């Protein structure tokens, strides 16, 4: 969690770039402290390492990466966006692999942020930065492909999850469907 909080603190540092450098450092440190010491991040049930407890940190990595990229895309002086896109891609890929329903939370935000920043980058004619917008999605695809390949090499099944695809999902679906011999709708 602390690594994600530190990434977020540096991601938002362009917001106070016009302030005194010393004051900017204090604000960055304050944002880190606020995020690192959130009560929800230090609750006893979140200190165990399993998927529900690491998902907020993965989301924070993703959102910090996208915010850091967006804040640097609108600057007058062009700044490299790829490090922030790589952080967003790592958070997106890990979050997507951590929870099956992460696509419902993360992908719409990713698409909206990418679209908005793409409009800004086209207006500024920053074509390389526009192409770099694909980095999070390439990292997501590479992560899913790697995970499926590992499942295939170890278990012989090229699938992301047995619960949502493959023979287990088909068997569960067959057991859950009700089959009646009657063709009367209310019987």
Protein language model regions, located:
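Membrane-interfacial entry segments at the cytosolic side of transmembrane helices
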Residues: 24-27, 79-84, 121-139
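Membrane-interface alpha helices of multi-pass inner-membrane proteins
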Residues: 33, 84-99, 140-147
